[in-house]
Amino acid sequence: VLFRSMRFVPVLAALTSGIPHFDGDLHARKRPMKALIDSLKKLQISIDDQGLATLPFSIASDGVVQGGSIEIDASESSQFISALMLVGARFVNGLSIKHVGKKLPSLPHIKMTIDMLKQVDVEVKEIGENYWKINPGIIKSKNWIIEPDLSNAGPFLASAMITHGEININDWPKNTTQAGNFWIEIFRAMGAEIELNDKFLKLKNSKEISGINIDLSQVGELTPVLASVALFANSPSQFSGIAHLRGHETNRIAALVENINNLGGDAQETADGLVINPKPL
């Protein structure tokens, strides 16, 4: 199972008849899956996971899921919520999802999921904070225009920040729910001039880079690239709210700190993030 699909495909598989089997490499087997597996079991979906709540596991289904209400701790990943939302309308009784854990990370991704569902006539109601109801119904077909991945624009924007240069990124959407859109807010705070028009986003940096103290809990995927820019700032930077990055394909916080320090930089882990003190590399 690919990393980016390992939390989405199993829920979809519950709507098929048969016994699909899911597995991955050693890193995938270590990634958090318990919240999703427990949720599927609460929905009376038969899962054989040897009681480990990780890959590998098998799902046995007749293709019909009754749905109902579940509570889930998705503090390790918003993907657990999105995966359930995407199929909830095909459950007989729909699905109500309530997050009951610590702070929910990466809310822009959940907002993106809801926005896309509404575009195909799926009714999603926000009942309360971190509490959603997806009504049962037909999912309308649609021809989609896929936006550019704004998070992946980060390295190119970072190159202009670090070299005090200028760059245009074509086709940057004016209205988007993508986490990568926060590059605009972040790099402006670090000293860049940014212009967005109908054709492109322009970033120009002619100043020293300012360090930044920022909660990245909603945009944790931006952390590695932002850390590279912070190395060249004129003051320390602190990133918080990203403890969940320790459960990704690798411990991203530990990997960043190790590699920054190996290059001669100065980075330290904190309880929920890291601190970077700029120094010559």
PLM regions with names:
Residues V1-L281:
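Short, structured segments at the rim of ligand-binding sites
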